[in-house]
């Protein structure tokens, strides 16, 4: 059941001595309501029509572009969000769930050094109501985070400090 998370639905393989992980192909059988953007312009904070929800398979691909900071805010509304912010100059991806609804004293910010020397090119998110799985650069790195955000917070916002273009592929996951 997806409400328990997707920890057992990874396909693992070894590449160059490292474990890479991806969601299993079978997840595609639950894909509904596709929404696709090719070269969507992001300049400042941007929302894309049809890109929202809390149970989905969302892939964002970035070409080499002139930006310093790119961010995706998931499970978002006026009060809540979980932000995934890439700082291109340092190669750091910051996962910030400060505003995800956490009420206890927990670590809310994690930082990941992107392993690929070419930087962050692709992010695939699997959202499952109260958790987010992120597959970085086709599974070279993986991050999981729990979110306590009310289920009504289903917005997705993109941000870039300079004009850039992304490709977005989104499917609702319906069991």
Tell me what each language-model feature is.
Residues 1-10:
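Single conserved hydrophobic/aromatic residue that forms the stacking wall/gate
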Residues 19-48:
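Catalytic and substrate-binding clefts that recognize carbohydrates or anionic sugar/phosphate headgroups
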Residues 40-102:
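Secretory/extracellular carbohydrate-interaction modules
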Residues 45-50, 109-116, 145:
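Beta-strand-rich interaction surfaces with strong enrichment in secreted/lumenal proteins
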Residues 58-60, 119-136:
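Short tryptophan-centered beta-strand motifs in secreted/extracellular beta-sheet-rich domains
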Residues 101-122:
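Short, aromatic/His-centered strand-loop micro-motif at the edge of beta-sheets
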Residues 139-153:
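Short, solvent-exposed beta-strand-to-loop segments that form ligand-recognition rims
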Residues 151-175:
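Ligand-recognition surfaces built from glycine- and aromatic
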């Amino acid at each position: 059941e997806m409400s328990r998370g997707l920890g057992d639905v990874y396909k693992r393989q070894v590449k160059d001595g490292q474990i890479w992980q991806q969601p299993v192909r079978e997840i595609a059988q639950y894909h509904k309501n596709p929404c696709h953007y090719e070269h969507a312009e992001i300049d400042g904070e941007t929302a894309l029509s049809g890109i929202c929800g809390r149970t989905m398979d969302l892939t964002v691909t970035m070409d080499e572009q002139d930006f310093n900071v790119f961010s995706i805010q998931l499970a978002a509304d006026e009060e809540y969000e979980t932000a995934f912010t890439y700082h291109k100059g340092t190669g750091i991806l910051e996962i910030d769930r400060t505003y995800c609804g956490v009420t206890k004293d927990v670590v809310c910010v994690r930082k990941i050094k992107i392993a690929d020397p070419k930087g962050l090119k692709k992010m695939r998110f699997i959202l499952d109501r109260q958790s987010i799985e992120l597959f970085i650069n086709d599974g070279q790195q993986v991050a999981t985070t729990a979110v306590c955000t009310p289920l009504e917070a289903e917005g997705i916002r993109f941000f870039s400090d300079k004009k850039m273009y992304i490709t977005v592929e989104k499917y609702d996951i319906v069991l």
